C-alpha cells in the first residue's frame, strides 16, 4: 500500500463479488432492473459506478427506478443525472440507495423510508404451502393478468386501481433474464403473488402481495417460499415492508442493514 493508492471501500461495481453482502445486493438489484427494462423495451441509462436508471413510464414508482451503485459523494451531480433522465412525462420514480443519502427534501423528493434489507441463508428447508393454495408460475397472458391484478389489489397500488389491464407483467417482461414470477390460487381465485430474481450470488424476492381478505392464512409466507425455491443454493434477500417483516422472519430472514427510498417527481 502506497500513500497515493486508494483504500478499497467495498462499494461499487468494481468490487469483487462476494466481498460483502450489501454490495452484492445493490449490484444485483441494479442488474435486475436493467434486465427487466431491456426485456420490456423501457428507457434505461447507466452511469457506470454511479447509478442505474430505468423508466417504465408507469404511475407506480417501483418500476421507474434509479438504483445507486455506490454511496453518493456528489448529490448535485446525481440530481442532475436524475432530472435529465426522468425529465419527460410519466409517473413518479424511486431513488433506491443501499446506503444513507443527504436529505433531498429541499430538492423536491419525498422520503419514503428506510426499510430493512433482509437475508436468509442458503439451503434452509421451506415449509409446505396450505393444502388449499395452488401456486403456479406465470407463463402466459392469463397468469400474468392474475398476478398483476393481485399485486395491484393486494399490495395495494392505488395508482393502478381499479385494475383494467396488464401494464407491468407484459409478455416481454416475462422474458427478462433471471426473473421468475408466481401466482397463488384458492378455488381458482388469485389471492397471492410474488417474484424473484436470481443473480450470480443472491436470490432477491420481489412483488409479494396477498389480498387483504385472505391475510393471516399463510398465503403470503407460501408465495414467498415459492419464489425462494427457484434456487435454494443461493442466500435469499429482500427489502421488507412493516407488514411483511414478521412473515419473512418466520421463513428465517434476518435484517442485515437498511436502505433508503426517496420518491422523485417528474416536475422536481
Model-flagged regions — what are they?
Residues 75-82, 210-230, 250:
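Conserved acetyl-CoA-binding loop-helix of GNAT-fold acetyltransferases
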Residues 104, 248, 253:
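Conserved active-site tyrosine of GNAT-family acetyltransferases
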Residues 1-87:
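N-terminal charged segments
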Residues 159-211:
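A conserved beta-strand-loop-helix scaffold within acyl/acetyltransferase catalytic domains
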Amino acid at each position: 500500500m502506497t500513500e497515493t493508492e486508494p483504500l478499497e471501500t467495498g462499494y461499487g461495481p468494481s468490487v469483487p463479488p462476494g466481498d460483502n453482502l450489501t454490495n452484492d445486493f445493490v449490484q444485483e438489484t441494479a442488474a435486475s432492473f436493467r434486465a427487466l427494462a431491456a426485456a420490456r423495451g423501457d428507457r434505461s441509462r447507466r452511469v457506470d459506478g454511479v447509478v442505474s436508471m430505468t423508466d417504465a413510464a408507469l404511475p407506480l414508482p417501483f418500476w421507474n427506478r434509479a438504483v445507486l451503485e455506490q454511496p453518493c459523494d456528489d448529490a448535485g451531480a446525481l440530481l442532475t443525472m436524475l432530472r435529465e433522465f426522468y425529465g419527460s412525462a410519466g409517473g413518479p420514480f424511486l431513488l433506491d440507495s443501499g446506503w444513507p443519502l443527504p436529505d433531498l427534501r429541499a430538492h423536491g423528493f419525498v422520503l419514503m423510508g428506510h426499510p430493512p434489507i433482509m437475508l436468509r441463508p442458503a439451503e434452509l428447508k421451506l415449509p409446505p404451502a396450505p393444502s388449499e393454495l395452488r401456486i403456479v408460475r406465470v407463463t402466459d397472458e392469463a397468469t400474468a393478468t392474475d398476478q398483476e391484478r393481485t399485486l395491484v389489489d393486494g399490495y395495494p397500488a392505488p395508482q393502478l386501481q381499479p385494475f383494467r389491464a396488464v401494464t407491468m407483467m407484459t409478455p416481454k417482461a416475462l422474458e427478462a433474464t433471471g426473473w421468475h414470477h408466481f401466482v397463488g390460487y384458492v378455488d381458482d381465485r388469485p389471492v397471492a403473488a410474488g417474484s424473484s430474481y436470481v443473480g450470480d450470488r443472491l436470490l432477491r424476492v420481489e412483488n409479494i402481495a396477498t389480498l387483504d381478505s385472505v391475510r393471516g392464512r399463510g398465503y403470503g409466507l407460501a408465495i414467498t417460499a415459492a419464489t425462494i425455491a427457484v434456487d435454494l443454493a443461493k442466500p435469499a434477500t429482500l427489502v421488507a415492508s412493516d407488514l411483511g417483516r414478521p412473515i419473512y422472519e418466520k421463513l428465517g430472514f434476518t435484517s442485515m442493514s437498511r436502505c433508503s427510498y426517496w420518491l422523485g417527481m417528474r416536475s422536481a
